[in-house]
UniProtKB/Swiss-Prot annotation:
Belongs to the universal ribosomal protein uL22 family. The lineage of its organism: Archaea, Thermoproteota, Thermoprotei, Thermoproteales, Thermoproteaceae. It comes from the Archaea. This is Large ribosomal subunit protein uL22. Keywords: Ribonucleoprotein, Ribosomal protein, RNA-binding, rRNA-binding.
Length: 185
């Protein structure tokens, strides 16, 4: 059963974050939030996706995650990359990447929710930039995995609480391209 949640960032903290990152003062009316509690997906992959989409516009993030679902573009892995394959990457910087399809689908649903929240507040969807995205561990769903000879091993399923905060920014400070520098081959 989902627990009560309050966003980890207040509107004042979001405004301060936007001022530090972009040098623009915004009001609480220019902020849109979305929250997805207790999602059954990988916490580690959720952190990587949240880190990657922070700073993108809403349309850029949706386009990139749709390509992840189609296995056309990967998400660079920065933290949890021990024993991961290093690819001859078509981008500069991070040779370790994954295609977290399940996580990308859940984030696409959340971005759709965020876009609807922004439109409800009267924000221009083309100027909405993701300023904060976070994935927090949720509660564990107890499960049992049957083993040989009548034994059983506890195998808990993890859940993730995901929140995304976006703000409507002036056109001058909106990022124009993705973070990965794609190499033409």
């Amino acid at each position: 059963m989902p627990r009560h949640h309050s966003y980890s960032l207040s509107d004042e903290k979001v405004a301060e974050l936007v001022f530090r990152q972009y040098g623009v003062k915004i009001t609480p009316e220019q902020i849109a939030k979305a929250y997805a509690p207790e999602q059954r997906m990988s916490w580690k992959k959720s952190i990587e996706v949240a880190r990657f989409i922070t700073g993108m516009t809403l349309k850029q993030a949706k386009a990139w995650l749709e390509d992840v679902v189609k296995l056309k573009r990967p998400i660079p892995i920065k933290t949890y990359k021990k024993k991961q394959a290093h690819h001859a990457a078509p981008w500069r910087g991070w040779p370790v990447a994954k295609w977290p399809v399940k996580v990308a689908r859940r984030y696409l649903q959340l971005l759709e929710n965020l876009e609807n929240n922004a439109k409800f507040k009267g924000l221009d969807a083309d100027r909405v930039v993701i300023v904060y995205a976070a994935a927090h561990k949720g509660y564990r769903i107890p499960n049992i995995m049957p083993r040989a000879f009548g034994r059983a091993t506890r195998f808990d399923e993890q859940t993730v609480n995901v929140e995304i905060v976006a703000a409507e920014l002036p056109k001058e400070v909106i990022p124009k391209r993705y973070k990965l520098n794609l190499v033409k081959r």
